[in-house]
């Protein structure tokens, strides 16, 4: 199970095929926690890219991962006059963004199939590819595919009817989301693939969704790693 909310809040619950919880990662954008129930260790520390990679395996910043999981391109900080966009013969726009920190981002975009005949300012775009390089080295590369619309989540009901329902966390939305996302980080040769079989927009978010307490009997380890 996965929850991702802008700008950098994320929760991942790893469950075995038999329904047994194996690990839970939470990050509110500032603090990170990973409860590894297999070895009864609770890791906690700053929400750095390398800490989040303890579960995802790919060291990318939290806001980058959240954007990609939502089917969006995390845009580098840049000057207003810097970006350029050209049409590629393979059937997509190539948006190139030079950042203020000597990095370059390349984003591949294309309209939804049903929007090709619409005026350009009414076309809804799909993000297919994101690549960020710095001084000639690839920092990360993401491929997004199998785009389809997703519904808005309904309220979360208390099965015992003791508490009022928790409403969706946002307005009605049916935007598309890529069902397959592949993220690669050449150094240290890491990659991860996400496959959505069921998803919805703006699910109810109970208090504490992006944080977790230490469970009794777990060994606590404070972790700090180099970015």
Please tell me what each predicted stretch does.
Residues 5-64, 192:
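An acidic-aromatic
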Residues 17, 57, 70, 201, ...:
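Residue-level marker of positions within ordered structural domains that often coincide
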Residues 36-121:
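Flexible, processing/modification-adjacent segments and terminal tails
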């Amino acid at each position: 199970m996965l929850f991702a909310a802008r700008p950098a809040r994320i929760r991942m619950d790893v469950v075995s095929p038999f329904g047994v919880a194996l690990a839970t990662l939470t990050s509110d954008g500032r603090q990170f926690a990973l409860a590894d129930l297999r070895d009864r260790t609770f890791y906690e520390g700053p929400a750095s890219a390398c800490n989040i990679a303890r579960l995802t395996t790919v060291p990318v910043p939290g806001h980058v991962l959240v954007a990609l999981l939502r089917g969006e391109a995390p845009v580098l900080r840049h000057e207003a006059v810097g970006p350029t966009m050209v049409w590629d013969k393979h059937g997509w726009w190539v948006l190139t963004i030079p950042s203020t920190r000597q990095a370059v981002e390349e984003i591949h975009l294309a309209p939804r199939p049903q929007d090709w005949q619409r005026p350009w300012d009414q076309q809804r775009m799909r993000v297919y590819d994101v690549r960020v390089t710095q001084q000639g080295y690839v920092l990360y590369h993401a491929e997004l595919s199998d785009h389809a619309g997703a519904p808005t989540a309904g309220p979360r009901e208390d099965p015992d009817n003791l508490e009022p329902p928790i409403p969706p966390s946002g307005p009605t939305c049916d935007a598309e989301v890529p069902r397959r996302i592949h993220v690669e980080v050449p150094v240290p040769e890491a990659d991860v693939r996400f496959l959505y079989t069921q998803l919805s927009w703006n699910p109810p978010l109970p208090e504490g969704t992006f944080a977790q307490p230490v469970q009794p009997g777990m060994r606590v380890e404070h972790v700090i790693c180099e970015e």
